[in-house]
Amino acid sequence: PITRKQIETALLTLKKVELNTTEQKELNFYLQEYKNIEGTDTAQLKAVQKDANQRLRGLYLHQKDFYLNVDPMGSLMRITSQGNSFTQMSHGLSFWGQAKQFSFQFYYKDYTENGNGMEAFRIASPEKSIIRLYNPTVTSQNFSEVRGSVSYSWKKGSISLGKDHLNWGYGENGKIVLDNKVSSYPLIRLDYHPTKWMQFNYTHAWLNSNIIDSNALYTAGVGAGSGELRVQYIPKYMATHSLVFKPMKGLHIAIGESVVYSDKTDIGFYIPVNFFKVYDNNRSNYNINAGSNGQFFIQASSRNQIKNTHLYGSMFIDEIRVASIFNRAKSRNQLGYTLGGSITDLFLPYLTLGTEYTRVNPFVYTNLVAAQNYTQYDRVMGDWMGNNFDRMMLFAKYNPIPKLNLYARYQSIRKGGQGTIAEQYLAEPQPPFLFDLQSKRKDWFVQFKYEWINNFYLLGSFESIDYTYKNENVHPAIQSGQTIQLGISYGIR
C-alpha cells in the first residue's frame, strides 16, 4: 500500500503541469481528499462539517502536529448471478490521522448477505475471500473485514505494524506475486528509499494455515457448548523483501524473494537483508522435509518511454532447475509470468486500450507441507486462478467525464488439473502444461463507477460467462450465465 503523503505529493506535481478543464476538475476533487491541512495552535473539533479542503467529514480534529479524521462507511448492493439473487449490506467506520512522525489508520466493515447464490458467486471468482461469522445458512451469512496500522516515518523511509493486504506487481484481473483478494493478515513492514533511484521493502506476516494442529489439542473444560477441546492451528508465516531500481525516467525494474514457513517463528526471517533461500537450506540441513517454501520474483515496467504507452512483465519462480530449463525430460519449471501493455489517448482522449497474457505452470504455489502452501486461509496469495492455467485478456478504460470510470474486459481462460504431491515432486518428466484439462472459460465484463462526492460511489457491472467443461460434474455450482451488480457505497473501498 502507498501512503496518503505519496498520493498528495503526486497530485501536487500535477499543479505544475498545464491541464485541460476535465483534468483540472479531477485534480481539485482528489486534492479535497488528500491535500494536507496545516494545523493551528488551537484545536478544531468539528462533526459532520466540511474541513479546510471543503471535504465533508463525519468528524475531524485538527491542530498543530496532530490531526484525526473519522468517517462512517456503508454500502448496499444487489447481486443477481446465474438466476439467483441476494442483497449485500454493510456498515462500518474508518479513521486515520497523524501525530508528527507517527501515523495511524483503521478500517472496519461488517457485511450481511441475504438471498440465494452467495456461495456460487465466489467460486472460481476474483471476488475477495471471506471468513464467515457465526452459523451461516443457505440464504444468509455474515462476515467482516478489519484493517489497521501504526507507522513511524522519517525522511527516507517508514516502519509499520498493522493488519492489511499486500499488492506486488501488475495485473488487470489478478497478480501472480501478491494480490489483495485474500483476507488481510498481521504484518510488520519496512520501506526504505536510500536514493531516488532505489527502493527497498521488507515484510514479515502472520498467516492463517486453517489446519488444526492435532498435537496441540488439550482439554479446555467440560460441558462447553462447542466441545471440551481447545483447538489450535498450525502457525504459518511469510517473509518477503524486494528491491526496486529506477535507472531512468519511466523504467522500473524490481526483484524480490519470499518464503512461507510454518510451525514456529524463526528470527532469521526477521533480518530484512538476509538471503532467505540460502538461510533456509542451512537451517534445514538441506532436508526437504525440514525446509520451507521459497520463491523468487522479478518485474519490469516501462511507462511513457513510448508516448502514452505502458509495457510490463512479471515472473514468479516457485521452483526451477536452471541446468535443465530446456530439457523436457528433466526440467522443473514451476513458474508463472504475466506480459501486458496498454496505450492511452488512442482514438479518444482518456481512452486506454490494452492486452495481457498470464500463464502459471502446474504446481506453482503448492508445497510438500500443506501448511506451507502459498495461501492465506486456503486462498492463493497470488493469482486467484491458482496454478496450471493461462488467461488471455483484452481491456478498455474510459473516463468520459470527471469522476466517471468505465471499464470493459474480454478474457479467455484455460484451467488444468491440480495434480498430486507425488506428481509434483517425483514425476519425471513433469506433467505438461494444462494436463488434465478441467475447463475453458470465456467472459465479457463491463463496469461503471461514479464518485459523486468524495468516497461516495454509484456502482454497476455486468458479466457474461461461458464455461466448457471436460467433465460437467467438476464444478456443478459454476455454470455459464450472467451476473449483474448494482449498488451504492460510501467510504474507502
Where do the protein language model's features map onto the residues?
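Outer-membrane beta-barrel channel domains
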Residues: T3-K5, A10-H252, E257-V259, D263, ...
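Exposed, low-structure sequence patches enriched in small/polar residues
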Residues: F143, K246-R493
